[in-house]
Amino acid sequence: MHALGRIPTLTLLIFINIFVSGSSCTDENQTIQNDSSSSLTQVNTTMSVQMDKKALLCCFSSPLINAVLITWIIKHRHLPSCTIAYNLDKKTNETSCLGRNITWASTPDHSPELQISAVALQHEGTYTCEIVTPEGNLEKVYDLQVLVPPEVTYFPGKNRTAVCEAMAGKPAAQISWTPDGDCVTKSESHSNGTVTVRSTCHWEQNNVSVVSCLVSHSTGNQSLSIELSQGTMTTPRSLLTILYVKMALLVIILLNVGFAFFQKRNFART
């Protein structure tokens, strides 16, 4: 009977913690699981942070729980796993995450929050906070995803074309044009998980002189204006005009040459 009474208490504490801590920590796409057989309550959270920004990962508020041991288990995608733990009874702090810019946000006996001072691609992975209490264990799992803003470049091409490129973004950026043109977009994936997107567009209409490239990304959007190179279109009428001009120039040249020839001949006779 006592074991059954533990679970509702833990569930209530979790609900209060999510509501209160939402003002200081970013919680996205949370799911709560309650395992009555093992007295384990788990919260899963997906978190996206821009590269070079500070990340704050919340656990359960220790003042609300009679915690004994707080442990962060960190599993990076491209680095060995490491742990950061604090024993509240012994007041001891242990870590195997040295050199990764991952520390307690404050003193763990007051707040078990974890912070990453400057997020990098190597910090992607899962961060699990485990709190051991006499009433049961609490577990909060973060899936940390790093966002990388792309480097945007653009330039006009030949024959009324323009190129817009979003280099090394994560996730891949999306490129659109105004007005619409005849576009070809290609993507190139890199070994670090970033993607370069390159879009080349062509406009046949002579009345289009300036176009806009919109680069959409999770870290922010950029809109750029490009002035098209004023390449002339070779229509049949323009080809005929060019031909007539060339023929007229040729006739003039021949007349001048002939006139000079006869003048020289007449001069030689005299």
UniProtKB/Swiss-Prot annotation:
Gene: Cd200r4
Carbohydrate-modified residues: N29, N44, N192
Gene3D superfamilies attached to this UniProt entry: Immunoglobulins
Any Pfam family hit: C2-set_2
Key words of the record: Disulfide bond, Glycoprotein, Immunoglobulin domain, Membrane, Receptor, Repeat, Signal, Transmembrane, Transmembrane helix
SMART domains per record: IG
A Gene Ontology BP annotation from the UniProt entry: regulation of neuroinflammatory response
Protein name: Cell surface glycoprotein CD200 receptor 4
Main location: membrane
Entry membrane topology: Single-pass type I membrane protein
Consequence of substituting L138F: Acquires binding to CD200
Cytoplasmic side: 263-270
Signal peptide location: 1-25
